[in-house]
Amino acid sequence: MSIETLKERLPDYAKDLKLNLSSLANDITLSPQQLAGTFVASAIASRNADVTRAIVAEYESVLSPQALTAAKAAAAIMGLNNIYYRFVHMVEGDYAHMPARLRMNVIGRPGVEKLDFELWSLAVSAINGCGMCVESHEKVVREGGLSAEQVQTAVRVAATVHAVAATLDGAAALGDHPAAG
């Protein structure tokens, strides 16, 4: 599987997603590792097995084994953090002052440049809808030297990958298939 396979599987009403997927796959705003890791972490966070397999197949040759593991780890740890910190942010009370008491060691030692891991964490946090985490990771990557355009590119990747995953899930449930070319 590949990004081309995903595009072929999208129904005709998702033409914009096909175009966005193509343009983002060829985007040069981010480094190859940053782009590939953002795609991989976003695919995992989008919870669609076919999308995850296709995107990992597309980008595993771009990433070192350590970087591939780090992208997976960003999706995993943000799956935990985004829920916990979204709760802390949404309710009033003592929770913000209480220790989380959850292991998050990978954040301190991700196995890749911290800036790349933070960017991938930002993309996953955008998918998972944790405003507190988005703000925190955005601040770190901007202070680390990434431009607003680079941050926007990562979030565009996250949004597009998530939309592709949701559309393919919906199309499968409804029996929507692309028109025969």
Curated annotation (Swiss-Prot):
GO terms for molecular function: alkyl hydroperoxide reductase activity; disulfide oxidoreductase activity; hydroperoxide reductase activity; peroxiredoxin activity. It catalyses: N(6)-[(R)-dihydrolipoyl]-L-lysyl-[lipoyl-carrier protein] + a hydroperoxide = N(6)-[(R)-lipoyl]-L-lysyl-[lipoyl-carrier protein] + an alcohol + H2O. The active site is at residues 130, 133. Transmembrane segments: none annotated. One of its GO terms (biological process) is response to oxidative stress. Belongs to the AhpD family. InterPro entries: AhpD, AhpD-like, AhpD_core, CMD-like. It comes from the Bacteria. Keywords: Antioxidant, Disulfide bond, Oxidoreductase, Peroxidase, Redox-active center. Signal peptide: none annotated. This is Alkyl hydroperoxide reductase AhpD. Its EC number is 1.11.1.28. Disulfide bonds join 130-133. It comes from Gluconacetobacter diazotrophicus (strain ATCC 49037 / DSM 5601 / CCUG 37298 / CIP 103539 / LMG 7603 / PAl5). Antioxidant protein with alkyl hydroperoxidase activity. Required for the reduction of the AhpC active site cysteine residues and for the regeneration of the AhpC enzyme activity. The gene is ahpD.
